[in-house]
From Swiss-Prot:
Monomer. Pfam families: LolA. One of its GO terms (biological process) is lipoprotein transport. Residues 1-21 form the signal peptide. It comes from Saccharophagus degradans (strain 2-40 / ATCC 43961 / DSM 17024). This is Outer-membrane lipoprotein carrier protein. The keyword Chaperone applies. NCBIfam families: lolA.
Amino acid sequence: MRLTKVCLVAVTMLVATVVRADDIDALIGKLDQFNTVSGKAMQVITSADGEEIQKTESEFKILRPGYFYWRTLPPYEQIIVSNPDTISVYDPDLEQVSIYQSEKMRNSPASILSGNRSAIEKQFKVTKSGASNDKKSTSFELSYLDTANADFKKLTVTFKKDQLASIVMHDMLDQVTSITFGKVNTKAALTPAQFEFTPPAGVDVIIE
């Protein structure tokens, strides 16, 4: 759970605003092609000098808007469950559950996939680009409008053949987190009830 400049002249600002709106339309258009999605993910974190720090595998489920489930598999097991009200983060090794109000996590990468247009517009500047050397891929670079409270410098969401393919995040220490999605199912039968989390008996519960 780790995941803009103001133009100087009126004409430039107008152009930037129009481009941003068009690019948000394009991103929302991609996201609106699915209401539910599930699959697997491979996450790799590299340092500023390119050294691999950590590699993990995960499984995820999304019900738009507002519902998100992410389980990182052992040996770094962690479960994140989000609904429109709360986000629960369960660390089995620590026997601890942290519960946050969803509003506090609105600038996370998860909010992009499970959120709505209004949330994206308030949080990000969106720039669309075609993925290099691959005409079937489309990428969207998102940078935070409120850089003072941002967890990442920027993140890039890529779709391939209209399918969610990857998210790449650059944090404030120049570490790069690359998430590659696989076995993506956009016809998953999901309901809000599947995104309710009950802390296991005996674990510490922290309300943030």
